[in-house]
């Protein structure tokens, strides 16, 4: 379910007077020394740094998440899943058990910690959907990615039963001598997404979306619509928290208000003030209104004031984080406990590596051409491993990867040329041809 509405608005600087003059290197090093708030890492083991990949509809699938994790991202959020689709089994439900798209199923044991985001219009349905997700989490012995299996029963080494896109048998990993680099990469991707998960499989928390600004969502009384109706929003929050076992954290995604009227500001305050008593672990607050969508600057000054008014609440910030420096500017200026990195990490998984480098007292390193190629190959191969069992999987993957290729191109000296070439990609051969031409064979 898209909450980005194919948004293509240009990056804008946040409203944060004096923030541009901050020494982000010193700030990052200080944050690295003190670490993330211990309450967060206690609730979500493995969430060890104050930033994470946001849920991005149409983007944050298993492939994007796994690539981000390989570059230092400590935690990811799925795109928003509709409660009714989860309960009734809509388009794609049989493919993956969850949501509209198979992309939201945990991508194997490496795709953790993972927070699943849900969105809906009726408290009982939202509660039931949350319970269904938790039940999915408890199926620790389930094969989440039954990819290209033969007629044999899945074994403890499912890679032995997998086939590559040409139908050839994929051998054990690591492959024996004689396999091409392409076969090795694909085998690695298949293993990553197909091996049997252990007891940590599933989702580590439930995130309730009360922020989505897309018009069709608002009209159906979902997402950001509820910021205009605090009574309904609180009813949903209470129903989900009551239904979910206490040991599993529930969180919420908000925007700073529905619009800029005093009435809507009071509505936000009423919702936010209820979170602790209901039992929500934290709130991620996007510093734009619902009516703004993604247009115009976000108000970091609002986040700063919110943190000051609620010093005991865990608050994450979102909005206008386009580079690694914005991560640390936001933390320092607003006082939020962690930063949700959204559009700024599309085609830029290195933002997470750079953040860890700065926290360790080092300068952030730009990706080399070779590193760009490796990340793009990994992203494509994992996407193909996940989708190839569906009809026209290679073509669908290639077309889907266009939007990522265009974003990855921003790091390349010939980015404009690459973007033009990416528009027409419709096969794995075409994708790899562009990489060979511009990124080296």
Regions found by a protein language model. Name each.
Residues 77, 115-117, 207, 251, ...:
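Conserved beta-strand positions in the central sheet of alpha/beta enzyme cores
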Residues 74, 81-87, 120-123, 210-224, ...:
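Conserved radical SAM core fold
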Residues 1-47, 52, 57, 63, ...:
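Alpha/beta catalytic cores of nucleotide-metabolism and tRNA/nucleoside-modifying enzymes
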Residues 23-45, 56-147:
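Glycine-rich, positively charged N-terminal anion/phosphate-binding segment
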Residues 131-145, 149, 186-206, 210-220, ...:
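Alpha/beta enzyme core
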Residues 141-144, 152, 161-164, 177, ...:
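Intrinsic-disorder-associated, low-complexity terminal segments enriched in Asp/Asn/His/Tyr and depleted
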Residues 88-92, 218-221, 264, 295-297, ...:
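Short secondary-structure transition/capping segments
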């Amino acid at each position: 379910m898209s909450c980005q509405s194919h948004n293509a608005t240009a990056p804008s600087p946040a409203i944060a007077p004096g923030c541009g003059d901050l020494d982000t290197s010193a700030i990052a090093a200080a944050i690295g020394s003190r670490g993330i708030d211990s309450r967060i890492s206690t609730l979500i083991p493995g969430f060890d740094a104050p930033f994470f990949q946001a849920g991005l509809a149409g983007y944050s699938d298993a492939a994007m998440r796994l690539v981000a994790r390989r570059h230092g991202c400590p935690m990811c959020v799925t795109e928003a899943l509709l409660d009714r689709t989860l309960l009734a089994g809509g388009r794609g439900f049989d493919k993956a058990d969850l949501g509209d798209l198979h992309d939201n199923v945990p991508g194997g044991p490496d795709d953790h910690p993972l927070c699943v985001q849900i969105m809906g219009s009726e408290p009982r349905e939202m509660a039931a959907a949350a319970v269904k997700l938790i039940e999915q989490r408890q199926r620790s012995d389930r094969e989440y990615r039954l990819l290209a299996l033969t007629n044999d029963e899945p074994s403890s080494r499912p890679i032995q039963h997998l086939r590559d896109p040409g139908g050839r048998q994929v051998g054990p990993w690591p492959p024996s001598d004689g396999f091409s680099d392409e076969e090795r990469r694909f085998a690695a991707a298949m293993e990553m997404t197909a091996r049997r998960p252990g007891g940590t499989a599933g989702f580590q928390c439930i995130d309730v979306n009360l922020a989505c600004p897309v018009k069709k969502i608002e009209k159906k009384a979902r997402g950001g619509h509820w910021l205009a109706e605090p009574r309904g929003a609180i009813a949903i929050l209470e129903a989900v928290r009551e239904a979910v076992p206490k040991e599993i954290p529930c969180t919420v995604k908000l925007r700073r208000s529905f619009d800029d009227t005093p009435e809507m500001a009071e509505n936000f305050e009423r919702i936010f003030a209820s979170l602790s008593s209901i039992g929500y672990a934290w709130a991620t607050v996007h510093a734009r209104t619902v009516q703004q969508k993604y247009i115009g600057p976000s108000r970091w000054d609002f986040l700063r004031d919110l943190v000051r008014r609620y010093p005991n609440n865990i608050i994450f910030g979102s909005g206008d984080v386009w580079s690694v420096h914005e991560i640390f500017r936001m933390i320092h200026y607003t006082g939020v406990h962690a930063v949700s990195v959204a559009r700024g990490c599309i085609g830029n998984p290195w933002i997470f590596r750079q953040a860890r480098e700065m926290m360790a007292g080092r300068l952030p390193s730009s990706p080399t051409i070779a590193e760009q190629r490796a990340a793009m190959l990994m992203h494509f191969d994992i996407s193909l491993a996940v989708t190839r069992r569906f009809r026209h999987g290679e073509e669908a993957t290639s077309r889907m990867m266009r939007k990522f290729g265009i974003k990855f191109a921003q790091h390349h000296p010939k980015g404009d040329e690459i973007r033009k070439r990416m528009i027409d990609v419709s096969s794995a051969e075409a994708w790899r041809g562009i990489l060979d031409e511009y990124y080296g064979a």
